[in-house]
C-alpha cells in the first residue's frame, strides 16, 4: 500500500497534543451511527480518524461530528483506483498487457478500477478532488492511497484466495497499457513496451 499525507491547514504554532497519537481508519457508511462510532473511538483513547468518505459532501457532513468528539480528522482518499470519475469515463480505465480494459475484465476484486494517469482528465479529476477536500474546514491532512496500478504479482500467501499461481508476470494482471499510454511511450522511446519479453 502506498500512501502519503498532505497538509490541508496552515502550520500550527506549536504542537498541542502529546505524542504518540493514536488513529484509526474508518470508511463512512451512512447506514451506521457515525456519532456513536466517534464517541466509541474517543472512549477507546483514539485521538484521530483517517476517514474515507465517498464524496466531499460526506466529508462536510462527518467532519463536524468527529470534531465534536475531539477527533483529529485526516481524509483518506483513493486516487487512481475506484475514483468517482471512473463511472463517468470508463474509457479512461487502465488496460492490461493483453489489451483488455479493466472496465471489461476483473483484476482480483470488483473494486479494482484503476484509471490511467496519462489521460489529462484523470489528472485534473484527482487534483480537483484533493483541492475540494482540502478546503473542507476541520480536515487536517489528506492520506493518498491507491496511487498506483494493479498489483502485477500478489504476495504468495494470498494466491489461494484467488485460485491463482503467479510464478512470473502474467499479461492479464499487468496493467498500465492504455492506448494513450502506449502511444506516449512509443513517441518517447520508439517502440511498443508490449513487445518486450
Q: What are these language model-derived features?
A:
Residues 1-15:
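Bacterial Sec-dependent N-terminal signal peptides
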Residues 20-25, 49-51, 73-77, 142-144:
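Hydrophobic faces of well-ordered beta-strands that scaffold small-molecule active sites
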Residues 42, 60-70:
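Surface-exposed amphipathic alpha-helices with a cationic face
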Residues 28-58, 136-139:
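Catalytic domains of carbohydrate-active enzymes, especially glycoside hydrolases
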Residues 12-37:
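Boundary/entry segment of secreted carbohydrate-active catalytic domains
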Residues 25-29, 54, 78-82, 146-149:
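Active-site beta-loop-alpha junctions enriched in small/polar residues
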Residues 136, 150, 165-197:
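Active-site neighborhood of glycoside hydrolase catalytic domains
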Amino acid at each position: 500500500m502506498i500512501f502519503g499525507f498532505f497538509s490541508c491547514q496552515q502550520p500550527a504554532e506549536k504542537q498541542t497534543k502529546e505524542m504518540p497519537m493514536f488513529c484509526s481508519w474508518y470508511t463512512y457508511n451512512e447506514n451506521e451511527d457515525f456519532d456513536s462510532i466517534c464517541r466509541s473511538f474517543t472512549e477507546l483513547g483514539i485521538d484521530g480518524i483517517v476517514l474515507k468518505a465517498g464524496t466531499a459532501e460526506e466529508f462536510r457532513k462527518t467532519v463536524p461530528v468527529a470534531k465534536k468528539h475531539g477527533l483529529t480528522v485526516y481524509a483518506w482518499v483513493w486516487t487512481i483506483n475506484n475514483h468517482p470519475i471512473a463511472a463517468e469515463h470508463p474509457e479512461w480505465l487502465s488496460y492490461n498487457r493483453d489489451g483488455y480494459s479493466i472496465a471489461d475484465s476483473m483484476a482480483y476484486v470488483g473494486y479494482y478500477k484503476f484509471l490511467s494517469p496519462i489521460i489529462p482528465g484523470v489528472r485534473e479529476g484527482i487534483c480537483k478532488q484533493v483541492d475540494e477536500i482540502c478546503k473542507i474546514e476541520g480536515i487536517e491532512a489528506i492520506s493518498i492511497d491507491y496511487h498506483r496500478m494493479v498489483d502485477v504479482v500478489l504476495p504468495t500467501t494470498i494466491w489461494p484466495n484467488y485460485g491463482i499461481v503467479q510464478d512470473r508476470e502474467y499479461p492479464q494482471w499487468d496493467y498500465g497499457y492504455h492506448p494513450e499510454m502506449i502511444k506516449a511511450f512509443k513517441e518517447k522511446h520508439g517502440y511498443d513496451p508490449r513487445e518486450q519479453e
